[in-house]
């Protein structure tokens, strides 16, 4: 039995998780993460963890995937201020957000870690996401023009040469 399983079985932890109103102070981040993980595994719904800034959100995500299966934890980043060093990472953030939204549409419960800006940032309506999801299989026949339009609608960027995550290139005949 690991530490997480042990804590989730403790009556004191269960009473904290099931309480409608409770105020907890003076705890460590590690304890808070354990409580969130217990809440996630004992509950029937996704858990959203909103932290004040991107740095803390990234740290929580990294710590959570250290003791929870990585497929149960999603990262939904949003950069508040884009510095010169962060411009290259912005595409990675966009792809991470798209992947998180796509995974949430599958309907299985997940723990989603984000920062405040990520939680309040405007997103496309649910119907728009659902209408634009598609899967390609080997030997499928698709319209290239329609495929390119759909990729752009989903947030991918059309470029001549791919240099970062979230870009795609269309090559003509040779």
Task: Give the positions of each predicted feature.
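ASCE RecA-like P-loop NTPase motor cores
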Residues: 1-174
């Amino acid at each position: 039995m690991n530490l997480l399983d042990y804590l989730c079985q403790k009556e004191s932890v269960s009473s904290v998780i099931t309480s409608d109103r409770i105020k907890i102070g003076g705890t460590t981040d590690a304890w808070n993460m354990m409580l969130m993980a217990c809440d996630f595994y004992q509950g029937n719904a996704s858990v959203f963890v909103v932290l004040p800034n991107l740095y803390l959100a990234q740290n929580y995500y990294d710590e959570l995937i250290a003791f929870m299966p990585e497929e149960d934890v999603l990262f939904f980043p949003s950069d508040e201020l884009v510095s010169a060093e962060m411009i290259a990472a912005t595409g990675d953030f966009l792809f991470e957000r798209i992947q998180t939204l796509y995974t949430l549409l599958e309907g299985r419960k997940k723990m989603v870690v984000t920062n405040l800006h990520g939680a309040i940032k405007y997103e496309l309506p649910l119907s728009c996401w659902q209408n634009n999801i598609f899967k390609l299989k080997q030997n499928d026949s698709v319209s290239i023009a329609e495929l390119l339009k759909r990729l752009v609608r989903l947030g991918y960027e059309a470029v001549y040469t791919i240099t970062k995550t979230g870009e795609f290139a269309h090559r003509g005949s040779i």
